[in-house]
């Protein structure tokens, strides 16, 4: 798939999706109260990504769920005793929850919430790409379909990608990476590994621009620049901190700067402001009206998660995630490798603390 074809496919997909309608304060309060009751009645737990609407994030926290990056979401859903997991995020997150928890019911506010990285990496084309390079270890980003994961040797998230590729490189393995070329390029540069890249990108992060960021830094010279590695290399080069969502949140909490220019989805501002209320957060500039995204610096698919469709799925159960048993087994292996590796990595870090 060419870059132009990829972008057209994403635009066509977005044209058929709808964001939740704006709600009044009283409507929100009523929906939230009903959702809390429904979660208890259904023995369900709400797991939300940092990029979802602040109302969804707050509700997850208030009801004993979690707000996290994709790795922690996977862990939490796997370990929580609830019989139903409601995933507020995008489709690959729901699929991952089902792969790790086949005995649980996994629901999403909408199954139409996908990801440009997922859309831009069709399983059949990716499998052909892998077949052309049988000597390479296949490493795929979590932002992929279950079918793509099933073709992989390893699954990674942005928080563990560098460590896993370093581990593989130390063993002399050459890497085939998909789908995000910017994250893959960053990992390639920081590890020195031999990495062959699939040509995919995130429609939100790709819109951050070096020139605009340079101008903004001139206006806020004391601000630290925080960048997600799905951003273009020129933007990454300007960063004071490059990291996953959880790593960027930690930076806001721990760095002495009072101001931060943040180059990732602005849904993260809710958690950043919650944990560091005295810090000033500034959105990094994007391509403006020429951007693919409906609302620059915010994923249009994450925005599809709303209170109304959350209540609907709890009451009706019609947005359930299903993964074929054979496909699930194949996708589980690389996911388990990631979870086991990161668990061991955390144990070693604790031992050295």
UniProtKB/Swiss-Prot annotation:
Main location: cytoplasm
Residues holding iminosuccinate: 49, 70, 141-143, 158, 228-230, 245
GO molecular-function terms, A-Z: 4 iron, 4 sulfur cluster binding; metal ion binding; quinolinate synthetase A activity
Entry annotated with the keyword Cell cycle: no
Biological or metabolic pathway of the protein: Cofactor biosynthesis; NAD(+) biosynthesis; quinolinate from iminoaspartate: step 1/1
Cofactor(s) needed: [4Fe-4S] cluster
Record Pfam families: NadA (PF02445)
Subcellular location, record wording: Cytoplasm
One record GO biological process: 'de novo' NAD biosynthetic process from L-aspartate
Enzyme Commission number(s): 2.5.1.72
Reactions catalysed according to its record: iminosuccinate + dihydroxyacetone phosphate = quinolinate + phosphate + 2 H2O + H(+)
Protein's UniProt keywords contain 4Fe-4S: yes
UniProt entry keywords in alphabetical sequence: 4Fe-4S, Cytoplasm, Iron, Iron-sulfur, Metal-binding, Pyridine nucleotide biosynthesis, Transferase
PANTHER family assigned: QUINOLINATE SYNTHASE, CHLOROPLASTIC (PTHR30573:SF0), QUINOLINATE SYNTHETASE A (PTHR30573)
Protein name: Quinolinate synthase
Species in which this protein is naturally found: Marinobacter nauticus (strain ATCC 700491 / DSM 11845 / VT8) (Marinobacter aquaeolei)
Name of the gene encoding the protein in the UniProt record: nadA
């Amino acid at each position: 798939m060419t870059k132009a074809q990829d972008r057209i496919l994403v635009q066509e997909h977005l044209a058929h999706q709808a964001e939740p309608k704006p709600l009044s304060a009283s409507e929100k309060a009523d929906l939230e109260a009903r959702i809390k009751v429904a979660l208890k009645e259904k023995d369900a737990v709400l797991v939300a990504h940092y990029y979802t609407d602040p109302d969804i994030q707050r509700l997850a926290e208030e009801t004993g769920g979690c707000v996290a990056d994709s790795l922690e979401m996977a862990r939490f859903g796997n370990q929580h005793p609830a019989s139903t997991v409601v995933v507020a995020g995008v489709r690959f997150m729901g699929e991952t929850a089902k792969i790790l928890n086949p005995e649980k019911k996994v629901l999403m506010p909408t199954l139409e919430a996908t990801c440009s990285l997922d859309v831009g990496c069709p399983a059949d084309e990716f499998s052909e790409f892998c077949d052309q390079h049988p000597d390479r270890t296949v490493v795929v980003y979590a932002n992929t379909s279950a079918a793509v994961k099933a073709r992989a040797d390893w699954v990674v998230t942005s928080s563990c990608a560098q460590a896993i590729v370093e581990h593989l490189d130390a063993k002399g393995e050459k890497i085939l990476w998909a789908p995000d070329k910017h994250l893959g390029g960053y990992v390639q540069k920081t590890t020195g590994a031999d990495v062959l890249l699939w040509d995919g990108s995130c429609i939100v992060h790709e819109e951050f621009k070096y020139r605009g960021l340079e101008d903004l830094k001139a206006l806020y010279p004391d601000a630290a620049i925080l960048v997600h590695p799905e951003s273009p290399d020129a933007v990454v080069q300007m960063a004071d901190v490059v990291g996953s969502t959880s790593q960027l949140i930690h930076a806001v909490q721990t760095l002495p700067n009072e101001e931060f220019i943040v180059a990732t989805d602005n849904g993260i501002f809710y958690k950043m402001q919650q944990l560091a209320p005295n810090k000033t957060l500034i959105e990094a500039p994007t391509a403006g009206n020429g951007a693919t995204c409906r609302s620059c610096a915010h994923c249009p698919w994450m925005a599809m998660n709303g209170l109304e469709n959350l209540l609907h799925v709890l009451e009706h159960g019609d947005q359930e995630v299903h993964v074929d048993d054979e496909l699930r087994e194949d996708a589980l292996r690389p996911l388990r490798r990631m979870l086991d590796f990161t668990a061991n990595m955390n144990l070693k870090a604790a031992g050295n603390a």
